[in-house]
Swiss-Prot record:
Disulfide bonds join 11-59, 15-35, 21-40, 25-42. It comes from Centruroides sculpturatus. This is Alpha-like toxin CsEv5. SUPFAM superfamilies: Scorpion toxin-like. Residues 1-59 form the LCN-type CS-alpha/beta domain. InterPro entries: LCN-type_CS_alpha_beta_dom, Scorpion_toxin-like, Scorpion_toxin-like_sf, Scorpion_toxinL, Scorpion_toxinL/defensin. It is found in: Secreted.
Length: 59
């Protein structure tokens, strides 16, 4: 699945550079990622990966 991965507090990973996000996403077993709207966006995450949900976002 695709989406904005979250940290242990449930917050999106903030970013300014695409290479940072690509590395962070790959560590979460995604195919890759990029920085979009100041947050990391991952593509190809496992289905069980936790991603940001605007309905429950508390950050």
């Amino acid at each position: 699945k695709d989406g904005y991965p979250v940290d242990s507090k449930g917050c999106k990973l903030s970013c300014v550079a695409n290479n940072y996000c690509d590395n962070q996403c790959k560590m979460k077993k995604a195919s890759g990622g990029h920085c979009y709207a100041m947050s990391c966006y991952c593509e190809g995450l496992p289905e069980n990966a936790k991603v940001s949900d605007s309905a429950t976002n508390i950050c």
